[in-house]
Amino acid sequence: YISGQYVATTEEEANEVYDRFGVYAIHAGRGDRLGGGDAESLDYFPREKADFADNKMPNPCYAIYLTCDPAVLADIDKYIEYAKTTKINAFVVNIMDGTSIGYNSPVYEEYSPTAYQYANNTVEEYRQVIQKIKDAGFYAIGRLTVFNDSFFCQDHPEYAIADQYGEPLMVANASYWPSAFCRYVWEYKVALAIDAVETMGFNEIQFDYVRFPDRTDKYEEAGTIDFRNEYGETKAQAIQRFLMYATDILHEYGVYVGADVFGEASSNYVTAYGQYWPAVSNVVDVISGMPYPDHFARNGTYRPWEHPYETLLDWTESAAKRQSETPSPAIDRTWIQAYNAIQPPYNEYGVQEIGDEIRGLREQGFTGGFMAWNASCSLTKLEELRPLYEALED
């Protein structure tokens, strides 16, 4: 599943090609602290990033997020008219978000009939939305969740993360996860991405939930979880190798590939769920951290979500260090919190707070843009943020 172009035939050749920039010394001391694997066993082969003449990525890229709910997509003309009057230049639209299915792709018929049955839109309904976005001159990013897929596990329990008896195990967020070690799952998600590119015309595929489930340590310690690790890989190896496989294939279709990672991935260790920033950034075209201030733990009386500028400033300092630890880093384009805090005192996030997040990113050198996460896709909220989005830097 990995291209032969990355294979060296001798140790001397491997050392010359793979460690040209001395990057392995950086990662050598980062062992397997949390069960996700060690950093040294991952791949840092310098990769030439894609730059398609007929598919130019906005720089910076400022995107708003849309679900695939029919009620949201019915308002696509309103979202487009709004974006035309601001500096917004891109849309992120769900192809698949767990059990929320964008359209009835024939790929589902083959791999996951249950997903096909529950599609929110027909192919033509969904295509009209993406075509309107592109016809209006906006960059179209298709968001596709990978290893959080209860429908697929229902159809293929043999590929699901299982309990000690071989039955699918409900894990994070009360959902079922196919194993990231299973190549059939890789094939399925890449086939779905290809269909979205060919049928809908997306400029970029963004993989989310490209990780193992978090908070599985209690099962691992008790020996009551089976990840179906057929090839004896670490979690981080499986995640990076999936991204290598997917990126190489999707580049053949002239589209960029992005990956979302938890905010924790900016730390200098391999996370328990297999995300390691330098290894992901080295492979994909765009890396998107998710440092939502209300997802950070409080420190005594200090609530990070009440200090969005300082929180993003500190986080980006760490993420920038990880970017420097790989020979071919991806473009940084960060998910920012564009919704009111979900922790007490439930701070409102408006022009000031979201502007502070953006300022924290830029002051640490993250200038690739942002994507504003608001799961409600509220037009009223967008109007409140108009002064901010009108004044964004070119």
Enumerate the predicted regions with their spans.
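Boundary regions of SH3-family modules and the immediately adjacent low-complexity/disordered segments
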Residues: Y1-R47, P387-A391
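Active-site-adjacent "subsite" loops/lids of carbohydrate-active enzymes
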Residues: F52-A71, Q128-Q131, G142, F147-D195, ...
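The substrate-binding groove and active-site-proximal loops of carbohydrate-active enzymes
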Residues: Y62-A71, Y108-V123, A172-E187, R228-Q237, ...
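Catalytic domains of carbohydrate-active enzymes, especially glycoside hydrolases
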Residues: D75-I101, V197-F207, V283-S288, L361-F370
